[in-house]
Amino acid sequence: MTVYLEDLQVGMSASLTHTVTEHDIELFGQATGDRNPVHFDEEFAKKTIFRGRVAHGALLVGYVSAVIGNQLPGPGTIFGGAAMEFKAPLRLGDTVTVTCTVRSIEGRKVTLDCISRVGETV
C-alpha cells in the first residue's frame, strides 16, 4: 500500500508486529558483519549489562524502515533520517510492535513518530 503525499494526514498511523528469532539475528549479523558476541554468545552476554543476548539495535531500526517503506507512506518513500532512543533491549523471542504516526507534513517533508513496544514496555 502506498499513501500518496496529498492523501497523508496528521495522525495517520501504521504498525508492524514481529517476533525476533534466532534466524533474524543470524541473518542481520551476516548482512552487516556485526558479529558482536552480545548478540550471539549467551555466556559472553550474561556478563554484560544486558545479562543475556540481545538483538542488534539496528534490527529494530529495520522494522521502523519496513513500516515506512511498505505501509506509511509506502513504496517509493525515502527514509531521510532519524533520531532514536533505545530504552530497553530487544531480545530473542520478544514480540515487538512498531507503530509510526504522522506528526507533521511540511511541503514534501513528512515527520513520523515511531514507537516500538514489547508487551507493555515502550
Question: Where does each model-flagged region fall?
Answer:
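Mid-chain, well-packed structural core segment of small domains
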Residues: 68-98
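Hot-dog-fold acyl-thioester-processing enzymes
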Residues: 1-77
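Short, charged/polar low-complexity linear motifs in solvent-exposed/disordered segments
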Residues: 33-34, 45-47, 79-80, 97-98, ...
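Short, intrinsically disordered/low-complexity patches at protein termini
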Residues: 38-39, 50, 63, 78-79, ...
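HotDog/MaoC-like acyl-thioester-processing domains
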Residues: 1-10, 89-122
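Generic structural detector for well-ordered beta-strands
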Residues: 15-19, 85, 101
